[in-house]
C-alpha cells in the first residue's frame, strides 16, 4: 500500500 511514500511498502 502506497501511503505518501513512493517506495516498496506493502
Swiss-Prot record:
Highest taxon of source: Bacteria
pH-related activity note: Optimum pH is 5.0.
GO MF term set: alpha-amylase activity
Enzyme class: hydrolase
Reactions it catalyzes: Endohydrolysis of (1->4)-alpha-D-glucosidic linkages in polysaccharides containing three or more (1->4)-alpha-linked D-glucose units
GO terms for biological process, alphabetical: polysaccharide catabolic process
Keyword Zinc tagged: no
Name listed for the protein in its UniProt record: Alpha-amylase
Lineage: Bacteria, Bacillati, Bacillota, Bacilli, Bacillales
